[in-house]
């Protein structure tokens, strides 16, 4: 795949031959001093300690943050949606980078040569490419998942099961392995240094131009292009739906309603049996003291459009409508009396038991149950939007972190010269991406923030939601 002429690649894609320093440069070709003394090191003691401390903090923060993400997804009810398994797999890849790749890249950097032998050199290079590639292929799969959940809301969400998501994750890792395996076929070991000096341990990998370019395209540029196009399309769909009034939206917009139900021409709710699979469509709320056709305001439990009992992107198939347990008995009767329509309301008065036009009669408790379910749906839709935004930020940060490295590496493949210091900076800047996703989740996602707080503050006995 990529050939490293320095003592060894510092990561996923080893530096090209164009970055090879001249022979005898101690920064890259330190050898035994005359008389069997110690090898020269690339950096001074102060610089070495600084690099070790910074890389150590990066590794600790990466492992800690991504372990929190995994625990949060498996323990928080608000994060148990099947598609969050993508985030678990992505976090696992970042943890593996911090534990199996960065430590050896750091040792190679500060020592100036490869110390760990031929076998681990092969494994190290393959794992480095594997984990980096899997990260971007994960993000590509996540972006496609978001696109399908928006454009095929009913059909796709019925198919979005944990088993299906796990199958996609396995496919992601297989694709990544296919990309990272070929370098093992052409890895060679060569001696460094010149003259009669003892050879320095080196680990070199395929540096053929066609392979370098094709690997960069397959590992970064092609998935990146797919993600950008998909999110542009998602943005266009969201913008179009925002501009079109609800009463004029077509079938695509209707798919965003609970169960894919369409609103009746009179604006009072959906027609039953429309767009449902195996269950009746559920009634949409009606504003009792406001403009007709507008949803009723959410209760205290649904403040900020957030239903704490539902997952961030839970399945869109609702339970059939019916009275809620909490509304049976005397309490339900008192609620029914309190919810009677008053003069001036947007709904016409009806006699007891008189069914509305085009819909069977419902009691006050059942009507309130429909309002609550529609409110939960609004909360779920709001979470879908926030989740899509968070993933867009994750993808954007990944591109910002890794694009400089892949761009400069592609330049080296076509013969352009890149300063070694700049090249190494871009590579380590890419490593930093592994630690940033937990920070992004904390800043932009309310559910992750609550889950992290619960995990870190065990004194709070409130249920994780």
From Swiss-Prot:
Top-rank lineage group of the source organism: Eukaryota
Phosphoserine PTM positions: 346
Transmembrane segments: 49-74, 86-111, 122-144, 165-188, 208-232, 390-414, 425-445
GO cellular component: cytoplasm; dopaminergic synapse; plasma membrane; presynapse; receptor complex
InterPro entries for the chain: ADR_fam, ADRA2A_rcpt, GPCR_Rhodpsn, GPCR_Rhodpsn_7TM
UniProt family annotation: Belongs to the G-protein coupled receptor 1 family. Adrenergic receptor subfamily. ADRA2A sub-subfamily.
Name used for this protein in its record: Alpha-2A adrenergic receptor
Species, as recorded: Sus scrofa (Pig)
Organism phylogeny: Eukaryota, Metazoa, Chordata, Craniata, Vertebrata
Gene name of the encoded protein: ADRA2A
């Amino acid at each position: 795949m990529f050939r490293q002429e320095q003592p060894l690649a510092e990561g996923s894609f080893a530096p090209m031959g164009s970055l090879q320093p001249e022979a005898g440069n101690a920064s890259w070709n330190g050898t035994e001093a005359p008389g069997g003394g110690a090898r020269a090191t690339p950096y001074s003691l102060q610089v070495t300690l600084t690099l070790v401390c910074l890389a150590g903090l990066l590794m600790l923060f990466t492992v800690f943050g991504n372990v929190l993400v995994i625990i949060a997804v498996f323990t928080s009810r608000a994060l148990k949606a099947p598609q969050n398994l993508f985030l678990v797999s992505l976090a696992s890849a970042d943890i593996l980078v911090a534990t199996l790749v960065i430590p050896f890249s750091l040792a190679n950097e500060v020592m100036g040569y490869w110390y760990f032998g031929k076998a681990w050199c092969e494994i190290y290079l393959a794992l480095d490419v594997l984990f980096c590639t899997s990260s971007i292929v994960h993000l590509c799969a996540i972006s496609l998942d978001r696109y399908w959940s928006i454009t095929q809301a009913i059909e796709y969400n019925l198919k979005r099961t944990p088993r299906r998501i796990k199958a996609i994750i396995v496919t992601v890792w297989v694709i990544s392995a296919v990309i990272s395996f070929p370098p093992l076929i052409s890895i060679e070991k060569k001696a460094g240094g010149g003259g009669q000096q003892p050879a320095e341990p080196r680990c070199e990998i395929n540096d053929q131009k066609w392979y370098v370019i094709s690997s960069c395209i397959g590992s970064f540029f092609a998935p990146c292009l797919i993600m950008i196009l998909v999110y542009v399309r998602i943005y266009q769909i969201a913008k179009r739906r925002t501009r079109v009034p609800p009463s004029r939206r077509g079938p695509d917009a209707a798919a965003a309603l609970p169960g894919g139900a369409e609103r009746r021409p009179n604006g009072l709710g959906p027609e039953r049996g429309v767009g449902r699979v195996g269950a009746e469509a559920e009634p949409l709320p009606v504003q009792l003291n406001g403009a007709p056709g507008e949803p009723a305001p959410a209760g205290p439990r649904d403040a900020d459009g957030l239903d704490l009992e539902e997952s961030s992107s839970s399945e869109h198939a609702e339970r059939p409508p019916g009275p809620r347990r909490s509304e049976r008995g005397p309490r339900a009767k008192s609620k029914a009396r309190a919810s009677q329509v008053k003069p001036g309301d947007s709904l016409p008065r009806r006699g007891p038991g008189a069914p509305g036009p085009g819909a069977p009669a419902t009691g006050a408790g059942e009507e309130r149950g429909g309002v609550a379910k529609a409110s939960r749906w609004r909360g779920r839709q709001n979470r879908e939007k926030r989740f899509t935004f968070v993933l867009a930020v994750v993808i954007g940060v990944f591109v910002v972190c890794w694009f400089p490295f892949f761009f400069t590496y592609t330049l080296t493949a076509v013969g352009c010269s890149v300063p070694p210091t700049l090249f190494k900076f871009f590579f380590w800047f890419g490593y930093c991406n592994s630690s940033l996703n937990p920070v992004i989740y904390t800043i932009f996602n309310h559910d992750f923030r609550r889950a992290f707080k619960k995990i870190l503050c065990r004194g709070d006995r409130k249920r994780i939601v």
